[in-house]
Amino acid sequence: MKDWLDSVNWNADGLVPAIAQDATSGRILMMAWMNRESLRLTAEKQQAIYWSRSRNQLWHKGETSGHVQHVREIRLDCDEDVIVLQVVQEGGIACHTGRESCFYRVFRNGEWVAVDPVLKDPAEIY
């Protein structure tokens, strides 16, 4: 029997991009990387666990901040090389900047403009 993880088209580093999407609103919250172990653990625990390329270790989202992502559904795209996690974001903050989403800047008139408020000072989170 084929392991379901073998269906994922992992990159040369054994990673796949994973997009966290709010399960209710559909808003994109963040993008991170997953390896086989983090995707397996995410499916098992129903909480988002990513692979930190900078720390070279598993990263259980919310372990430090309390902003855990509860996974409602895991999707694989048609090319099998991108994962979407539909999540319920505990605390309403996904971004390390203290915002709901990491995608808080909009390109307007030739520059990037922050359009989403900081919900909590990152110094109070970390």
UniProtKB/Swiss-Prot annotation:
User: Where is Mg(2+) annotated to bind?
Assistant: 77, 79, 81
Any one Gene Ontology biological process term?
Answer: L-histidine biosynthetic process
Q: What does the record give under GO molecular function?
A: magnesium ion binding; phosphoribosyl-AMP cyclohydrolase activity; zinc ion binding
GO CC annotations on file? cytoplasm
The UniProt entry's coiled-coil ranges are none
Q: What is its EC number?
A: 3.5.4.19
Which compartment or compartments is the protein found in? Answer: Cytoplasm
Pathway involvement of the protein, from the record: Amino-acid biosynthesis; L-histidine biosynthesis; L-histidine from 5-phospho-alpha-D-ribose 1-diphosphate: step 3/9
Superkingdom to which the source organism belongs: Bacteria
Q: Which family does it belong to?
A: Belongs to the PRA-CH family.
The UniProt entry, under HAMAP family, shows: HisI (MF_01021)
Q: How does it assemble?
A: Homodimer.
User: What name does this protein carry?
Assistant: Phosphoribosyl-AMP cyclohydrolase
